[in-house]
């Protein structure tokens, strides 16, 4: 008796859910039309690298009149050039000795300034935020 009851149900299931192994019967799913993940990642990284080459990240321009000179109490916070080279390995075409000297001179002059007012700090922070927002 159970075989008699199951036959109408199985016919109904075959009509509602036809079993087919051919690709001609159905259109491919929508996800098959999406871009390949690897090419999308490559395109994104190439556009990001091009953006960095075109608009390199820069330090905010600060007027020296808005800053006051402060004495450097300790050099422990300053990253040495060898640590910096290990963390940020980049292709460099030029004289490494002159680049290290220029970087140390720049870091010494930049670390010796503090903002004279909160408004000067807020202006630089707002400029950095706008730069970040334009890149997002």
UniProtKB/Swiss-Prot annotation:
Its main location: membrane. It comes from the Eukaryota. Present with 450 molecules/cell in log phase SD medium. Interacts with ATG9. The C-terminal 10 residues are required for the association with ATG9. Disruption phenotype: Reduces the autophagy flux induced by nitrogen starvation as well as the flux of the cytoplasm-to-vacuole targeting (cvt) pathway. It is a peripheral membrane protein. This is Autophagy-related protein 41. It is found in: Preautophagosomal structure membrane. Residues 127-136 are annotated as: ATG9-binding. GO terms for biological process: autophagosome assembly; autophagy of mitochondrion; cellular response to nitrogen starvation; cytoplasm to vacuole targeting by the Cvt pathway; macroautophagy. Induction: Expression is dramatically increased under nitrogen starvation conditions and is regulated by the transcription factor GCN4. Keywords: Autophagy, Membrane.
């Amino acid at each position: 008796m159970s075989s008699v009851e199951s036959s109408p149900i199985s016919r109904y299931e075959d009509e509602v859910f036809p079993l087919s192994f051919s690709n001609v019967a159905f259109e491919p799913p929508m996800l098959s039309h999406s871009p390949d993940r690897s090419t999308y990642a490559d395109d994104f990284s190439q556009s990001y690298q091009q953006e960095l080459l075109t608009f390199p990240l820069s330090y905010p321009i600060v007027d020296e009149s808005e800053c006051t000179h402060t004495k450097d109490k300790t050099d422990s916070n300053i990253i040495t050039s060898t640590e910096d080279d290990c963390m940020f390995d980049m292709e460099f075409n030029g004289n490494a000795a002159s680049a290290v000297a220029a970087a140390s001179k720049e870091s010494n002059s930049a670390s010796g300034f503090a903002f004279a007012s909160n408004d000067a700090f807020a202006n630089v922070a707002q400029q950095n935020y706008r730069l970040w927002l334009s890149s997002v």
